[in-house]
A protein has these predicted regions:
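Active-site-proximal cap/lid insertion segments
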Residues: 1-113, 117-127, 179, 184-220, ...
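Short coil/turn segments at beta-strand junctions that form active-site/ligand-binding loops
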Residues: 59-61, 143, 304
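Residues embedded in well-ordered beta-strands
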Residues: 86-90, 162, 169-171, 307, ...
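Conserved beta-strand positions that form and line the central face of beta-propeller blades
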Residues: 89, 102, 132, 146, ...
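C-terminal cap/loop subdomain of S1 sulfatases and analogous C-terminal strand-loop tails that border
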Residues: 113, 120-221, 274-288
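Short, compositionally stereotyped local motifs that mark structural "simplifiers"
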Residues: 236, 246-250, 258-378
Length: 378
């Protein structure tokens, strides 16, 4: 756990708190944890580079470093503001080629596959969406725009599309009747999120913090990221940006058509279309052998995987654990064994005190999503 003893950032180091977060010690503490983890990661990367050097491979290796999304704090990860989209990207070439050079080109994650192939001297296939920005098959043109999308937010659902050039960001909200803030159990565990909710309920949010808690959204948003890096001032209705807004809107429409965007299809229908004749195959029940409280499991369906968990309220086991070897089950506790292959229906066995008490077969994966995840969009 990352408590005070794990902090690697000096308390004397000043912290710049983004204006949409609480301007107090709660957010500062969360940010110190983030920066401490960055320091720890930097040390880990140094160890890997040293290992490559010791093995004589460092100057024969291209190292590409990037994160998987923007910041982890509220109004960052999962959102299409730069705080959620913008990530670090560092490329280390052998023998210090282009060392310490900064590059302001627009790069999208879809550019990574063709670029890595290009770096290896392999021509990217034409079906890849991205542009190679390095290597033998580097694209002759640079990106004018990058694009973003947000749909499912864990247990909450929305539909937002984004277009960004080097300065301006355009957002299209397909569900403007929904609030900006959507409750997510994982995010609610963050102290800064808990503090924002406390401040909201107490009426203590300032104007910048309150923006995220508006109960409906503008259909379109436009931000000047040069003048407004935190994207707090929507200029979509400003007449002087009328032509820019139109160009961004048209680019969003063009991109959605080009990639055959499925966002407007009801999620249940989209999932149903994945399967031949809309029918899902069933993972076969595994072979379960029980000896007193010892449980051994063997898969039957090729390619399927096994997981287990306990359901006792007194000593719960949160989430599934991969089955690797026979389990010594707990007395007077329910052990659940799940067999699942991706794209198939799962089967779950419940075991109590050495006996199988129940076998659960979902009716269809489609109906499961209909109950749990279905949503409609305009």
């Amino acid at each position: 756990s990352w408590d005070d003893k794990n902090m690697l950032l000096s308390n004397d180091t000043p912290i710049n708190i983004p204006p949409y977060l609480p301007q107090n010690s709660v957010a500062e503490y969360d940010l110190r944890k983030v920066y401490s983890r960055v320091i720890s990661l930097d040390q880990w990367i140094g160890e890997k580079l040293k290992a490559l050097e010791d093995d004589g491979l460092l100057e024969e290796t291209i190292v590409v470093f990037y994160s998987d999304h923007g910041g982890p704090l509220p109004r960052q990860k999962r959102l299409l503001y730069d705080s959620g989209l913008k990530v670090p990207l560092i490329i280390r070439y052998p023998n210090k080629q282009r060392a310490e050079k900064r590059d302001d080109r627009l790069v999208s994650f879809v550019d990574f596959p063709p670029t890595l192939l290009s770096m290896a001297g392999i021509a990217p296939p034409t079906y890849m969406q991205g542009l190679a920005f390095e290597g033998k098959y580097k694209s002759k043109v640079d990106r004018k725009y990058i694009h973003g999308h947000a749909d499912r937010f864990d247990e909450s659902v929305d539909m937002i599309r984004a277009v960004r050039d080097k300065r301006f960001k355009y957002l299209k909200n397909f569900n403007p009747e929904k609030p900006y803030y959507l409750p997510l159990d994982f995010r609610r565990r963050l102290p800064s999120m808990q503090e924002l909710l406390r401040m909201r309920d107490a009426g203590e949010l300032d104007a910048n913090q309150a923006l995220w808690f508006r109960q409906s959204k503008a259909e379109e948003e436009l931000f000047d990221t040069e003048k407004d890096p935190h994207e707090l001032n929507n200029i979509a209705d400003d007449p002087q940006y009328k032509n820019l807004l139109l160009a961004m809107r048209q680019e969003c429409d063009r991109w959605m058509k080009q990639i055959d965007d499925k966002g407007l299809i009801d999620e249940k229908e989209l999932i149903a279309s994945f399967y031949p004749n809309r029918k899902v195959k069933q993972t076969k029940a595994p072979n379960i052998k029980i000896n007193d409280l010892d449980v051994a499991v063997e898969v039957i369906t090729p390619g399927s995987r096994l997981g287990f968990r306990y359901t006792s309220e007194k000593n719960p086991h949160y989430g599934w654990t991969h089955y690797k070897q026979p389990i010594s089950s707990r007395p007077d506790d329910t052990l659940e064994i799940i067999a699942h292959r991706i794209g198939y229906k799962a089967v779950t066995h419940k075991i109590y005190n050495g006996a199988i008490t129940e076998v659960l077969y979902p009716q269809t994966r489609i109906e499961y999503h209909d109950v749990m995840y279905s949503h409609k969009r305009p």
